[in-house]
């Protein structure tokens, strides 16, 4: 399980975090997760999520294409909180574990979230691995609080290399299973020792 009862969660915008949010809603409706509060910059699913838990939208400038809020007001509002868990997307992760986004605003938002979270789950499709994007916001490293959640399509050589370097990686049937109960038989955990920090 990525989330436990009482978690205060930041949920990023983007397709993969959206799927995680849907799985989170399913657990809340089923009663397997309770007393959760969510802060999000996503306009895509905040209304639906608010029907099953307490949801707070960040401040910020609307980005219609991404259906989210960003910019300095968003960074400042996020910095007021402390999250027990956070879910972020990634547009790219290079071979050394550097996490990156397509633009500075998205990267700065991610940096701010990492600085104010106890544990961070970066959700990335295996097709984005070993392929850097434009602006970095953190790095997988041994002993850090960031966990990479990806699918079984990750190349074996890359997974072995990252394990040797102490990165923490969870392998699921798909990254969209990230919010589901890890005991439901639909996903498996691959814990290769930990990492990351902005």
Each model region followed by its residue ranges:
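Conserved SAM/SAH-binding loop-helix junction
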Residues: 19
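Glycine-rich beta-strand-to-loop/alpha-helix junction loops that act as flexible
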Residues: 12-15
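HTH-adjacent hinge/linker in prokaryotic transcriptional regulators
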Residues: 1-10, 22, 26-33, 50-51, ...
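Short beta-strand element of Class I
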Residues: 36
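Conserved phosphate- and dinucleotide-binding cores of soluble alpha/beta proteins
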Residues: 25-27, 39-198
């Amino acid at each position: 399980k990525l989330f436990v009862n009482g978690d205060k969660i930041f949920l990023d915008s983007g397709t993969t975090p959206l799927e995680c949010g849907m799985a989170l809603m399913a657990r809340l409706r089923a009663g397997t997760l309770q007393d959760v509060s969510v802060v999000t910059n996503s306009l895509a699913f905040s209304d639906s999520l608010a029907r099953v838990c307490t949801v707070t939208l960040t401040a910020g400038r609307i980005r219609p294409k991404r259906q989210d809020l960003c910019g300095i007001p968003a960074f400042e509002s996020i910095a007021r909180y402390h999250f027990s868990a956070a879910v972020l997307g990634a547009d790219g992760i290079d071979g050394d574990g550097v996490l990156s986004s397509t633009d500075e605003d998205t990267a700065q938002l991610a940096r701010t979230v990492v600085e104010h979270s106890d544990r961070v789950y970066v959700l990335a499709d295996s097709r984005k691995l070993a392929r850097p994007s434009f602006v970095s916001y953190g790095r997988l490293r041994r002993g850090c609080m960031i966990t990479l959640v990806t699918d079984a399509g990750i190349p074996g050589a890359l997974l072995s290399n990252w394990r040797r370097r102490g990165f923490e990686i969870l392998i699921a049937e798909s990254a969209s299973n990230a919010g589901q109960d890890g005991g439901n038989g639909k996903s498996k955990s691959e814990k290769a020792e930990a990492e990351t920090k902005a």
